[in-house]
Amino acid sequence: MVIPYVIEQTARGERVYDIYSRLLKDRIIFLGTPIDAQVANVVVAQLLFLDAQNPNQEIKLYINSPGGEVDAGLAIYDTMQFVRAPVSTIVIGMAASMAAVILAAGEKGRRYALPHAKVMIHQPWGGVRGTASDIAIQAQEILKAKKLLNEILAKHTGQPLEKVEKDTDRDYYLSAQEALEYGLIDQVVTREEA
C-alpha cells in the first residue's frame, strides 16, 4: 500500500508527515482496512495517545472497513468505551460486520454516515478444523461471540435484542438513512461542520 505524504510549511521551515500522522495531529483516526490484531493495536494506541493528550477533546474515527476479526474489533470497542475523550464515528463507504459494531459504539449523538455510505450487520462466522472436541470448543466460542455482539448492538441502537438477533441471522445491509432509522448512527451528514 502506498502511503501519501504531506508537506506542511511552518515558521521553522517544512515538515513532512505521512497522511495518517497528519490526520492524528488533528485528532482524526482512519480505519480503512479489514480489522485484524495489527490494525486494532494501531487504532487502540491512537485512541490511548489522543485521550492522554486531552481527555476532553473529541476524537474522530472515520470508518471504511469490511470488518474483520471479532477479538480485534472488541479491543477497539472496549478502548472506545474506556477512554474519557468522546469518540465520534463517521462511516464513509462501508462499515460492515465488526466495523458496524465500532460505528454504533461511537459517542451517542456523534455517530454519522455520509449519504451514500452502507452499513452491514450479521452474525460472526468462522471456519474450524481439527478434532471433534476442538470443533465443539470453536462452535461454543462463536455462539458466545454472536450473543455478545447482538447485546452490544442492541445496547447502542436501542433495538430489542430479539430484533437484532433476527436481523443479524444473515447479512443485513442498510443505507445511511436506514442506519439512522435503526439507531446505528445519529445523523446523515453531507458536509463536515467546523
From Swiss-Prot:
GO biological process per UniProt: protein quality control for misfolded or incompletely synthesized proteins
Major place of residence: cytoplasm
GO cellular component, as recorded: cytoplasm; endopeptidase Clp complex
Cellular location(s): Cytoplasm
GO molecular function: ATP-dependent peptidase activity; ATPase binding; serine-type endopeptidase activity
CDD domains, sorted: S14_ClpP_2
Subunit: Fourteen ClpP subunits assemble into 2 heptameric rings which stack back to back to give a disk-like structure with a central cavity, resembling the structure of eukaryotic proteasomes.
The protein's name: ATP-dependent Clp protease proteolytic subunit
Organism: Thermus thermophilus (strain ATCC 27634 / DSM 579 / HB8)
